[in-house]
């Protein structure tokens, strides 16, 4: 039976690590012994909320998903600090209410820039280094909205981008497979984060998923050996027929 991948000195990049799911992932992986490169637009907030993490095992770097140049700068800084890259967690994202009756073109453009183009750039820049790892991992945080359009309360723009993210994750799986790279789209339902504040139609607060639960799922995927690939991992907070 194949052993799972131990954290050892494996290096994981996590985008959007200053709040919500990203912060939970950072804290959980740090506790397991991973070396972390944490990216966020608000560097001051990132430094404050991750101050308790081991300083010798954590790099903090600016990553604004709307700024293409931040991608290469972050990758370069990660390699300069740790000398390797073993996993990428695409977590940074936004939710804007864009439907046929609400929102505007600028909001739709922001959704695509942050939720789709930014993780595409990160995967493209990280792939050569993940291939060299021999057991590279890409975990992209999608949504149950990646799998279906639930009802009229859902942001059409958001659902469109989350469907695209699922396609992106599957493409990454094919791109790196022969070199040991495995890609997983982790698809949480309503989670207790600021992202859902004031959004209609979501599961009420007490019934939402704890971000620490998502962090545990990410850690599980990162430890799986190459012969145990998980392409999609939906985690729902409500009863649905196919999710």
Q: Could you describe each region identified by the protein language model?
A:
Residues 53-68:
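Rossmann-fold cofactor-recognition segment
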Residues 32-49:
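Conserved glycine-rich Rossmann-like NAD(P)H-binding loop of the short-chain dehydrogenase/reductase
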Residues 137-164, 170, 174-177:
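Catalytic loop of short-chain dehydrogenase/reductase
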Residues 178-181, 185, 201-243:
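C-terminal helical subdomain
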Residues 18-19:
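Conserved glycine-rich cofactor-binding loop
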Residues 9-10, 84-85, 130-143, 178-182:
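Active-site loop of short-chain dehydrogenase/reductase
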Residues 99-100, 107-112:
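Substrate-binding pocket helix/loop in short-chain dehydrogenase/reductase
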